[in-house]
Amino acid sequence: MTARTPLPSTLAAGAFTTAELHAAGLPWRRTLAADLARICRGVHTAGIPDPCAPDGAAALVRLTGGVVSHVSAALWHGLPLPPRLARPAGLHLTFDRSARTHRTDLDGVVSHRVRLPSDHVLELPDGQRVTTAARTWFDLAGMLRPHEVDWLIADGDHLVRPPWTPTGRADPVATVSELSEVLARCRGRPGVRLARAALAEVRVGADSPPETFLRLALIRAGLPEPELQVAVDPADPASPVVDLGYRGRAWPSSTTAPATARLSSRRGTPVGTRTASNGNGRPCAAPGRTSALGSGGS
């Protein structure tokens, strides 16, 4: 049985490379002890051997010089993904094709070798290197199928929205112009057509994928594009805000069923706003008010 020389705290806290083990004054055979697990060749851990875990990913980045990218970077940035991509089989690492690298065929690593400008990479304090949010959005376009374009639009919406914080809205993670710039610099890459189509439909103001999907469904059903984050009563500073709405529109009522007007206090339709059902479940809003879709404050 291999003796268990205690690990220094810098190594015991997470994953480490064999070179880091040697630098700490421990021999290679220490990796054979039962308290350590092998993530892949050259990387071990005292915890669960998961290359996608933060410490495992950081160690693999240090070992290979790669950059966390694609689906792995999307998860790091908190981007919504279709179910088939939400649990990647391995850690996606990108290596700049102009740089000399080694050990890119490791177990648990999905390697990509492409041009990767330095301004498309985030350098984190723990040694982690991750593609920027805008570059990650573009890289996802090469992994999504044409019928999944709505997910790419939702990812774009997610990045350009001003997110809620305890003190109000914050600056967005990326801007539409930043997405456009990355797209222009990645011409000829897989996914460029899908990214271009998605970018044309990215909007500021959608706070969740369901809001994006609803907007797209309305447009594709032949309805006008709704506004996002609309005050129900623009004249009232304290007015609630709805996710989607048609400001000042009056829906024509059905000619085959009488419209029944009612007063409603439900969210999105303030008391005193006259609404009607046209027999098909479609709301009829009085001009000067907002016909609300979705719920506000998300």
Residue ranges with predicted function:
Residues 1-191:
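Short gly/ser-rich loop at a beta-strand->alpha-helix junction or flexible surface loop bordering the NTP-binding
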